[in-house]
């Protein structure tokens, strides 16, 4: 649901039910937080969305695969820090 539709729906619900209490708002925020965390867990483990997996789960990328290879953005050598270039 788009943000505008969701806000309109929330507004209409508020008008129907009346003013909400602090506890109602707190419960709604906690509920949305739980839903967001669950959606994030599902997205990480969903095989249909491989780009959302954490880097440790991608088999084709080794942790030190880029060391000693030309830097992709600048075309120069890979550096450990700007002042300490890696020479290999």
UniProtKB/Swiss-Prot annotation:
Pfam families reported in the protein's UniProt record: Herpes_US12 (PF05363)
Region (Active domain): 2-35
GO MF terms, alphabetically ordered: lipid binding; molecular sequestering activity; phospholipid binding; TAP binding
Subcellular location, principal: host cell
UniProt entry keywords in alphabetical sequence: Early protein, Host cytoplasm, Host nucleus, Host-virus interaction, Inhibition of host adaptive immune response by virus, Inhibition of host TAP by virus, Viral immunoevasion
Region entry Disordered, spans: 33-88
Cross-referenced InterPro entries: Herpes_ICP47
Residues the UniProt record annotates as site (Binding to TAP1 subunit): 22
Compositional bias per record (Basic and acidic residues), positions renumbered to this chain: 33-51
GO biological process: symbiont-mediated perturbation of host microtubule cytoskeleton; symbiont-mediated suppression of host antigen processing and presentation of peptide antigen via MHC class I
GO cellular component, one term: host cell cytoplasm
Subcellular localization(s) per the UniProt record: Host cytoplasm; Host nucleus
Domain of life: Viruses
Record's compositionally biased regions (Polar residues): 76-88
Family to which this protein belongs: Belongs to the herpesviridae US12 family.
UniProt note: domains: The N-terminal active domain blocks peptide binding to and peptide transport by TAP.
Assembly, per entry: Interacts with host TAP1 and TAP2; these interactions inhibit the loading of peptides onto MHC class I molecules.
Function summary: Plays a role in the inhibition of host immune response. Binds specifically to transporters associated with antigen processing (TAP), thereby blocking peptide-binding and translocation by TAP as well as subsequent loading of peptides onto MHC class I molecules. Empty MHC I molecules are retained in the endoplasmic reticulum and ultimately directed to proteasomal degradation. In consequence, infected cells are masked for immune recognition by cytotoxic T-lymphocytes.
Protein name, entry field: ICP47 protein
Originating species: Human herpesvirus 1 (strain 17) (HHV-1)
Classification lineage: Viruses, Duplodnaviria, Heunggongvirae, Peploviricota, Herviviricetes
Primary gene name: US12
């Amino acid at each position: 649901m788009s943000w505008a539709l969701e806000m309109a729906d929330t507004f209409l619900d508020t008008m129907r039910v009346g003013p909400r209490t602090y506890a109602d708002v707190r419960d709604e925020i906690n509920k949305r937080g739980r839903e967001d965390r669950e959606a994030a867990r599902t997205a990480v483990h969903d095989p249909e969305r491989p780009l959302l997996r954490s880097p440790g789960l991608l088999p084709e990328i080794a942790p030190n695969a880029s060391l000693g290879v030309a830097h992709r953005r600048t075309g120069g050598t890979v550096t450990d820090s700007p002042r300490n270039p890696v020479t290999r």
